[in-house]
Amino acid sequence: MVVFLLAASAFGFFVAANFKEHLSIGATAYEGTCRAVTLSEANRTKHYQRVLTRFSDGKKVMLYLPLSGECPQIGDTLQLPRATIVPTERQSQASYRHFLMSKGACGVCYPYTYRLYKAQHSTSVRRFALSVRDRLLRRVDSLIESEQSRAIIYSVCFGYRNESREVADKFRTVGAAHIMAVSGLHLGIVVYFVWFLLAPLISSARQRRWLSIVVIAVAWIFALLTGLSTPTIRAAFMLTLYEIADVWGVSRDRINVLAFSAFVLLAIHPGFLFDIGFQLSYMAILSIALFYPLFYKTGRARLRKNPLISYLYGLVALSISAQVLTIPLILYHFGSTSLWALWSNIPLVILSGALIPLVLITVLFIPSGVLFSTLGAVIAWLCNVILEVIESFLQMGGGMLRVHITLGGMMALYLMVAALYQAVLILHHRVDGYEALYGSEKRLKESIRVPRNFMKPAYLDGLTSGSQPPLSIK
């Protein structure tokens, strides 16, 4: 693990140095009229509409448009009277610089006015995905009346986060902000639901291959329904590699698949290295792959007799293992983390696991009518339970740990965790070896039962008295 961390760090520093040099530009001023094509959907903040664009000279620039203007979509053209670009490297906050680098933006611009030209015939797959998501959101509007419940469904099920910021702040305070952002967790819930329905029907290796194809198709359909967000594409790509390796009979080692998928994505777009979501998602998966077997194995033997307690212990082990390697990264980027994250994630993940499949089935396959309204009432009840769970943790108070660490401090923490992991791994191997030896010796003694009337040969009596055995036995 230490070698893996050092190799990953060296590769990361190499990519970061080359990508920063690629984005480095001086302050640029466009005096005349300039045009920019939108590359992302507009994200509405308190004061601006934030949208990533590409100028006519090929530069990617993050525009902050006034809220009073029309909301642009992917593929639309913005005409600006004049624009001054502030370079990315001149941004004072390191986290904001990393955010711009993750998008490939070389600078920021704040135009006071603009003219919008809608795209007539857009061939963008992302724009098509967003239009599909918008139609599903309109069905949610007809299904749920409460604004807070709609905000939860928008974020948890479809990755649309331009609604209630109050709900998002509550999730963030209890350490469950990742549930509000569609990612690998949500795709995993959908895929597991499909697998749970179809796995009992599988009885041969050929059917298992067809199940892998269905799982891959469901993963990419879910990515399409959520607007082809980057975290969902990342998770679908990783799942695709894992299932292809299974179909072809190749080793499905999670760390190998994880490393290969990260290498491919960074080769396509090196800016992902600066994306906090990219860092957290890969670090969480690596943490689960390394620590979940240790945590779960420790208590599984003792809790095997009670399936319910064993299942709950598995959730606790999963929650703990996912946070071992993500906490140093969170402290480095944000300087704080929630102490309730360990416990709040268990009920919230369970409730989300029921909410996401139910919402998708309702809005995709159930026509308007009595059943549609009944399922809407069940969905609204689940959203209310989620809000009550969050409120119960908020009422406890004092759940924030505020510690800001530097890059060197973060690397030191990871080296300490790596050393501790190696020590625990060695201890587990020694304990397992002792138990295997002791268990085999005990089974050997129980399997060999000497009869009471057993007569030993004479030369064995001689051995017990200290004499040498004869050279030949007649």
Q: Residue spans of the language-model regions?
A:
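Aromatic-rich juxtamembrane segments at the membrane interface
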Residues: 106-238, 243-244
